[in-house]
Structures are given as structure tokens and as C-alpha cells.
Amino acid sequence: MDSAALSGFAPAACAGFLPAQDAVPCSHAVEFYQDRDAFLDGLSDFIRSAIQSGGACLIIATESNRQAIALRLRTSGVDLPHAVQNSQYLLLDAEATLDRFMVDGWPDSQRFFATIEPFLMHAKASLGADVKFPVAFGEMVAILCADGHFDAAIRLEQLWNELARKHSFALRCAYPSDGFADGTRGKDYLARITAEHSHVLTA
């Protein structure tokens, strides 16, 4: 999916994953990607920037993507054991986290807040003196869409936005673009998901 396919959908667009120091509190950005490796490269750069600037990251991702991110961070010189020990690099499994707040195929708002808020607060408490807010990446919405639960994914995006009205953090999420290839239906869900974000990130 190229940037032209997103025209008219996005409140704003920017190239790639913004460096963490350029993110703004309560921003909620989304990337629709075709190339997984390129996506992971950009996401890993975003996380590395946050860690090296004294920030803290909450990463909610699948096991395969957590491993791929860790490899990229180590290769780029990030001391992951140190980051983990200092709570700058907080990891949650996306599927296990979903299981904690999904009820009958739908995100339960109270369970969502009870699940995510403590980790956000922990990340905030781990920030360096000159860092104002943590950053987060969430892959749970992509899992819901991959399983055909598009409406539940949209509701989860809305819950993240509700959380952002209570806490300052910068959120990134991402979807494989081939999940929206189903003609008019796919285009409709693409527009609705995009509308829940402040930025669309393009390669």
C-alpha cells in the first residue's frame, strides 16, 4: 500500500517511524506495511532512539517480532539487559495480553485499563530526568484484524485513545497492508482504523 492509497484517510502523514525525541505526548500513529523487515527496521530505530535518550518503551508484540526487534537492537549497540533492568524496555506478549481483557470477542474497557495502565505508569517512573513521557508499540490490533475481528480492533484503538486522555505517552501501532485487500470492505475498515490515529506513517 503506497501513500496515495491513504490520501483522504489520515489526519496527518509522515515518513517512517518518527525518532522518539520527535514524538509528541498523546500522539497515536499507525503504519500499514508491506515489507515486514523494513517495518521492523523502522520500529527498532524508534525504540533504540527512545532507550538511548533516557526514555522508556512498552512493547506489546508477538514472540517472533519481539525476537526480531531484540536482534536489531543488540546489533545497533543497545545494552538490552541494562535497559530491561532499568525498566526502559518493558515487554508484553500481544496474544497473552489480549487474553487478559477480551470478553466474548470484544475488548472489555475496565479490564483493558487494569491491564495496560500499570505498565504505562511503570514506564513513566523509569524515565530519565529530561524525558517527559514514555513511548509504546502495540500489535494487538493487528492480531484482531488478522483473525477477522476488525470492529474489535477499532474498539481497541478507541480504548487506547481514551487511555491517552488520562496519561501522556506516544503510541505506535502497525498492520500488514494485505489485511485490507478485500475491496470495498477492506477500504472501509482502513478508513475507520486510520480515523482513530493522529498520524499515518509511510515508508
Predicted regions and their residues:
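Non-catalytic regulatory/interaction regions at protein termini and inter-domain linkers
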Residues: M1-A203
